[in-house]
């Protein structure tokens, strides 16, 4: 077992009002799972990914990685969990604006073999000619593909992807999801949020969220 989420709750305030983004969510993610998370906007899907990824501290409950609560450890442990075990593709991409595409990708490379694979990923994602461009010089789709390569380049234990093909044409969507499936076949674990049928067709498990809860 790779990850266990036990009864996590997360609330936010909007002005004077409080709303619940996650309401007692529990979930087991086994090594080698390919989990697709569905649900309407505001259902809690992205908040769940952020909690799994070590980015937001739940108000209650626990997120266990190999038996250790990632939020009940020293911050350095949480940082190592995020850097060494998680590949995260955000909807907002979060590319460093002062770094080129290839420099952004290298931020996620911890071994020489990861760096050696960069050009193959750039070619398969049609970004070879953009490798020395800065984020402001890229289209939204090109930024998305660069963010994807950064997330997957180190073959992390767990790939978290939030709408990974949302800004891509069918050809680039297919190329990206082919790389995700190859990663999964080699033993990687995937948690993916998407409304795109192509993105979820390889999923081995599916859940649906509504109002911060898993309903199906």
Where are these regions (language model features)?
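Helix-to-loop junction immediately C-terminal to a conserved catalytic motif
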Residues: 53
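ABC ATPase NBD coupling module
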Residues: 70-87, 185
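Conserved ABC transporter NBD signature motif
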Residues: 61-72
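Conserved ABC ATPase signature
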Residues: 134-144
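Hydrophobic anchor residue at the start of the ABC signature
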Residues: 148
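Conserved signature/switch motifs of ABC ATPase nucleotide-binding domains
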Residues: 133-136, 154, 186
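Catalytic Walker B motif of ABC-type/P-loop ATPase nucleotide-binding domains
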Residues: 159-162
């Amino acid at each position: 077992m790779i990850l266990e989420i036990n009864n996590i709750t997360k609330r936010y305030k909007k002005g004077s009002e409080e709303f619940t983004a996650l309401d007692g969510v529990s979930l087991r993610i086994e090594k080698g799972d390919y989990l697709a998370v569905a649900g309407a906007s505001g259902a809690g899907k992205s908040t769940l990914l952020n909690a799994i990824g070590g980015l937001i501290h739940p108000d209650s409950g626990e997120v266990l990685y190999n038996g250790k609560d990632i939020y009940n450890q020293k911050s350095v442990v949480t940082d190592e969990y995020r850097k060494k075990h998680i590949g995260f593709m955000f909807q907002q991409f979060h590319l460093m604006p002062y770094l080129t595409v290839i420099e952004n990708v290298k931020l996620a490379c911890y071994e020489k073999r990861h760096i050696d694979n960069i050009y193959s990923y750039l070619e398969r994602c049609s970004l070879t000619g953009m490798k020395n461009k800065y984020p402001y010089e890229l289209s939204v789709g090109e930024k998305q593909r660069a963010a994807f390569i950064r997330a997957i380049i180190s073959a992390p234990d767990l790939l978290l992807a939030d709408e990974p093909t949302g800004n891509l044409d069918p050809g680039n969507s297919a190329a990206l999801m082919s790389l995700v499936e190859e990663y999964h076949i080699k033993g990687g674990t995937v948690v993916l949020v998407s409304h795109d049928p192509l993105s979820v067709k390889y999923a081995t498990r599916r859940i649906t969220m509504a109002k911060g809860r898993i309903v199906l």
